[in-house]
Regions:
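Bacterial Sec-dependent N-terminal signal peptides
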Residues: 1, 7-34, 383
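N-terminal extension/subdomain marker
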Residues: 19-149
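Structural recognition of the beta-strand scaffold that forms the well-ordered cores
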Residues: 36-41, 70-75, 154-157, 201-205, ...
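Short acidic, gly/pro-rich beta-turn/loop elements at beta-sheet edges
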Residues: 47-49, 81-83, 165, 215, ...
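Surface-exposed flexible segments
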Residues: 49-59, 84-96, 168-183, 391-399
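Terminal, contiguous helix-loop blocks that mediate binding/assembly
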Residues: 142, 146, 161-163, 169-413
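Active-site groove signature of glycoside hydrolases
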Residues: 148-164
Length: 413
């Protein structure tokens, strides 16, 4: 009898429960982002404060997410973080897409940067190391991939940079870890990334002068898309608080919104009387090889004109630290063809540069960009005034692939 009554009660509870479930809407599960983002910040230089601020901006961006998402940040800077006061470590932030980060309600606008750093989960610490060493970068990236396994990965690199060059003032191409000579070439950087044996959805270069065809060529087989600036990037860098949700959602249209957010941010600063300038591009890596074929065709066809070419007729992107570092690619091709862009070249540029934007008015005014002659991609044109650059230029794979090796200059090259 007791068993029977228990059975009746259990059936009653089950029926009541079923009826309740039918009437009460259940909360929808929060979707998970398919992309995990890895940020590699080399800040043992005068960008320490700015790159720390970027971590805070990334946190703010995560707080606005409506997806579950993971962010890992490798930090190498002057500022020491955590209870062990580490200078080389990996921070982890995970949002549930419902306003919580690392299991706690996201910090509000009154929180300090130290509060944000305290909220991080420190998942790895390192002894003192040079983060711009190829093997060190590869090891750290492999650690990050292991710590946050994902089928899709995105990369952010933040530091100083100088496009393909091995020298502007120092040996910098990317990064500056302490002394000026503690830097790395982009070929080594590309190899360090490639050796993780992962294909990345995107690389966002929060660093100067990385929006050149030489850089795009170097990273073409490593990631699907490249987001970069052909000019210097202001010290604040990219406004991560405005676009993390787009980076995590992926696809071309969202990456375009990332680029637009960058220019909108600096346009707002300019409109309010602040120092501001910006160039940004979205590059389709799989189309870079086809673009290089078109470039080579044009360089070889016009090699006599290029033998003693006057670069002063072109829009230059090295406004202060890097005179001669990059000129507008499409404007060069147009000038070589009497002011007309060949149809095949123009068509390929549209396939390769999926988005471009800039500030036509800037502060200082010398950083303003002529939109009519801005194609979203720069190119180095050998000039007599840069003999050391030229010597190094001839060692690059790009030198042959682009057709520059077939130009006989009217000066010692």
């Amino acid at each position: 009898m007791k068993k029977f009554l228990v059975g009746i009660c259990a059936l009653f509870v089950l029926l009541v429960s079923c009826g309740k479930n039918d009437d009460t809407p259940q909360p929808k599960p929060v979707p998970s982002s398919e992309i995990t983002i890895l940020a590699y910040l080399v800040a043992n230089n005068n960008l320490d404060d700015d790159l720390l601020t970027n971590i805070g901006a990334m946190y703010d961006g995560l707080a606005e997410m409506d997806q579950q998402a993971t962010l890992l940040v490798y930090w190498d800077g002057k500022t020491k973080i955590g209870s062990n006061k580490a200078q080389h470590l990996i921070l982890k932030y995970v949002t549930d897409g419902k306003g919580n980060i690392n299991g706690l309600p996201a910090l509000d606008m009154n929180a300090t940067l130290n509060d944000v750093l305290d909220e991080a989960e420190i998942v790895k610490e390192y002894e003192t190391q040079y983060s711009v060493d190829k093997d060190i970068m590869n090891k750290v990236l492999k650690d990050m991939v292991t710590l946050a396994p994902s089928s899709k990965l995105g990369l952010i690199f933040g530091s100083h940079a100088s496009s393909w060059l091995n020298s502007i003032y120092t040996s910098r191409a990317f990064g500056q870890d302490g002394a000026g000579d503690d830097t790395m070439l982009i070929q080594d950087m590309a190899e360090a990334i490639s050796s993780t044996n992962k294909k990345y959805e995107f690389i966002l270069f929060d660093a100067c002068y990385m929006g050149t065809v030489e850089v795009a060529y170097t990273f073409r087989n490593i990631c699907d898309y490249q987001i970069s600036s052909v000019m210097e990037v202001p010290a604040y860098g990219f406004p991560y608080e405005d676009f993390m949700k787009y980076l995590y959602k992926g696809n071309v249209e969202n990456y375009k919104l990332v680029c637009k957010s960058f220019v909108d941010f600096y346009q707002s600063l300019y409109s309010n009387g602040n120092t501001a300038w910006a160039t940004v591009s979205l590059i389709d890596s799989k189309e870079v090889g086809n673009l290089v074929n078109e470039i080579k065709k044009e360089i070889v066809e016009h090699k006599d004109a290029l033998a003693n070419y006057d670069v002063n007729v072109l829009q230059e992107y090295g406004r202060t630290a890097g005179p001669y570092i990059a000129y507008d690619l499409e404007q060069l091709i147009s000038d070589l063809n009497g002011g007309n862009v060949p149809a095949t070249f123009g068509s390929q540029m549209l396939k390769t540069v999926l988005y471009k934007n800039s500030l036509e008015k800037a502060r200082p005014a010398s950083y303003a960009v002529d939109a009519a002659n801005y194609s979203g991609m720069g190119i180095y044109i050998p000039v007599e005034k840069r003999p050391k650059w030229n010597e190094y230029f001839k060692t690059l794979d790009w030198y042959t692939a682009s057709g520059w090796s077939e130009v006989t200059f009217n000066w010692k090259f």
